[in-house]
Structures are given as C-alpha cells and as structure tokens.
Regions:
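Basic/aromatic-rich interaction segments and small domains that mediate binding to polyanionic partners
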Residues: 2-70
C-alpha cells in the first residue's frame, strides 16, 4: 500500500474537493467497479486515498498509487 506525502495530499484535496464528480479510470481490486463508473467525492484522507460515494451505491476508495480517476 502506498501513502502520499503531505504535499501530495494537499494537491489531491485541491484537485478533488468535496462534492466534485469523479470518473473511475482504473481500480486494482478484486471487487473493482467498472471503468467509467461515476461518483461524488467525499474527501481525501491523510494517506491520499480519495473517498467516493459511487452512483452504484458502493463506497470503495480510489487508493493512492494503485487506482486512478479523473
């Protein structure tokens, strides 16, 4: 598991503010959501993971260093 440093966490929080819409590009998880799944950002934790409420009802995080979204 990768962790972001404080500067990266601050950058991610500016790029993904609470309430912004997110589109999943890639997720490395055995229960991964399909690419293109959309959701709403609930914040970025201190490790750099993006917390998302997906439109499917899932709450899987976008893991820093493993997954990607825009």
């Amino acid at each position: 598991m990768n962790f972001a440093d404080q500067k990266m966490v601050e950058k991610l929080r500016k790029e993904f503010p609470v309430g912004c819409r997110i589109v999943l590009d890639e997720m490395d998880d055995r229960q991964a959501l399909p690419i293109g799944t959309q959701g709403t950002c609930n914040g970025v934790d201190d490790a750099g993971n993006i917390l998302v409420s997906w439109d499917t009802g899932s709450h899987l995080n976008v893991a820093y260093g493993a997954d990607s979204c825009h």
